[in-house]
Amino acid sequence: CLDADWIRRLVHLKLAMVGLEPAHGKLMPAELSGGMVKRVALARALALEPELLLLDEPTAGLDPDRSQNFVELVGDLQRELGLTVVMVTHDLHTLAGLATHVAVLADQHIIAFGPKAEVMTVDHPFVTGFFGADRRKLL
């Protein structure tokens, strides 16, 4: 059985790591903004002290400013904690802000995998369509 005081301190620490106050830990999800819900979910994952963090569409539903803030937060945590982050995203700005390596899935197959800059130059209709004219901006 874990000590209640230890759990409270852990919750406060992990909330602080994602930019939230201890009071946010007492609120129900409906009382939080979309960005705060994402941050609470991230704090919950960090409570387990992971080496690998799995994120599924981490910025979905966030406005561009909150999305950028979340990308910066995950990037900071990745560097500070030495995390490996595996992420599913369709958001090019999230990909540009966090990814070093990319796997592109199409037709139930991995059609490209490697460093971000290399994958963006793959001559495949899906890859060129997905990255489109934004290729240069994303590198």
Which residues are covered by each model-predicted region?
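A short, surface-exposed alpha-helical micro-motif characterized by mixed small hydrophobic
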Residues: 95-97
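H-loop/switch region of ABC-family ATPase nucleotide-binding domains
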Residues: 89-90
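Conserved ABC ATPase signature
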Residues: 28-32, 36
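Catalytic Walker B motif of ABC-type/P-loop ATPase nucleotide-binding domains
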Residues: 53-56
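Conserved ABC ATPase "signature" region
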Residues: 6-23
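Conserved catalytic motifs of ABC-family nucleotide-binding domains
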Residues: 49
